[in-house]
């Protein structure tokens, strides 16, 4: 089971005397931010970072094909120890969503967090505040490996998700879904801001479309 499902986008562009792999040779993997939009520039479907190490281009005269790969940054989390949004160590008890938001913030992407996970504690209200990640707390010691040292952010997310839910990026937001709700045709989700604060409850948009023989796309 894979609870963290990273995504990447591959872009191909023609090179010229002014544009080639040399434009990126001095960059790092979190220097060039990539946004993929459909229709209009504001209709962003994917946000990530250009993976400089994955650039590909044949060393032949222009024009040539330059292949650029953008990743969502989730792989970066394997090398970053858990701290809160401000960069300080967690102490005492904190909401589960605060750990999730702090870990995802280390990707460098301030994206909203969509949670479709409708298991609730028996006394929780039927409101965004009652979402399990917002209502339930975990002690910071849950993720402490030794005194003053914590799991990396990737491991923290794996522990929280377990085999119950998965995390990916969908339509320019982090998306957490409970596996047993995958076939739910009337799903309810809670949107959190990138820092873990509650935004709203909404009925999640279904990813399906009916296409007739005379329909135009």
Question: Where are the regions that the model predicts?
Answer:
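Beta-strand-rich assembly/attachment modules of structural machines
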Residues: 1-92
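Charged- and aromatic-enriched interaction segments used to assemble
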Residues: 56-215
